[in-house]
Every structure is written in C-alpha cells, then in structure tokens.
Amino acid sequence: MNAQPPVIIVFGAAVRADGRPSTAMRLRVEAAARFGTALEDRGEAPLYMPTGGVGRFGASEASVMAGLLRRLGVPAERIILEETATDTLASARACARLLRARGHAGRVYAASSAYHLLRCLVLLRMAGLDAHICPPPRLPASTSFRRRWYWRLRELVALPVDTGLMLWLRLTQRQPPGARGPDARA
C-alpha cells in the first residue's frame, strides 16, 4: 500500500438552474465512486477532489459533486473541494496547486466523460502530477448522435489549445514543474 492515498479528481460539468447535477456530472461522480470502491477493495482508501467553480447557477460544481459523493457513501473527510476552476485547464492547475500545498506526490486519477479524459490526463501530467485515468461512465451523457459528436469534435480543438496554453505557462515560469512551497504557482 502506498504511503499517500490516491486522489480521484472529478472534473466538473454543468449544474442545472434548480441546483441539481446535469446527467454528465452525475455519471462522472458515479464512475468516480465506483472506481473508488474498487480501490478500497484493493486496500487503498482514495481521497476525492471534485473540481469546478460556480457556473451560471448558484452552487459550485465541486460542492454539488461533493453532495453526490456523500450520498453515494463517501465520507466527507475524504473529499477535498476545489471550487475556483472555470474550465479544464484551470481545474488541472488548481488541483495540482492544492495537492502540492498538501504535500501530496502520489497517484491521481482523472474522472470524467470518455470524450474528455485524454485532455484531463494530459493536463494533469503537464501540471506535474502522476496522473492516470479512472474508467469513464458506462453510458454517454447524451444519447443524441449529434450531441455526442459535438463533444468529441470540441475536444479535437480543446486538446491542442489547452496543452499549448499549459506549455506556455510552464515555459514562462507561471507554473514551475513539480513546484513546492508557498511560491509555487499553478
């Protein structure tokens, strides 16, 4: 067993106007909880880091996901909220910053929708984390052929844009790789 517990980083999705999670968010959280249970069965008690700030409606994505995790049986003390990020790149950077501040240098797992996982993984690794993927939700968030392809094609643009931005941030020392201490910026 590792000295540090693995951390499952759950990437946010929309919160509905009534404060309920979108289907994509619910499926991501359920997949993360299922994977966390599998880790527990292997003797590892993971921490969960839902990430996502306030979108168009009241509550932060992270707080809504934390509520879902608690309803799925995850103890509150194993949940670390990251409530500032407004997109995937900001989530990767903010989670890396939070984990460094906690002295965490162990494994992290990205939990998201299948179409989104590659970008999450690449950005977390570029942020200096030992990142892996959590098995994605078993069902797509949308059954519409057009919607599913929209999200996949969106990733074709978002992946090179976000990796280019992360590379620029690292090259300009706005995020030193493996940075430690109070001066570490992510």
Stretches with model-predicted labels:
Residues M1-W149:
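A structural signal for short, hydrophobic/glycine-enriched beta-strand patches
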Residues F145-Q175:
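A transmembrane-helix-recognition feature enriched in membrane-embedded lipid enzymes
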Residues G178-A186:
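Active-site cores that bind ATP or allylic diphosphates and position pyrophosphate for catalysis
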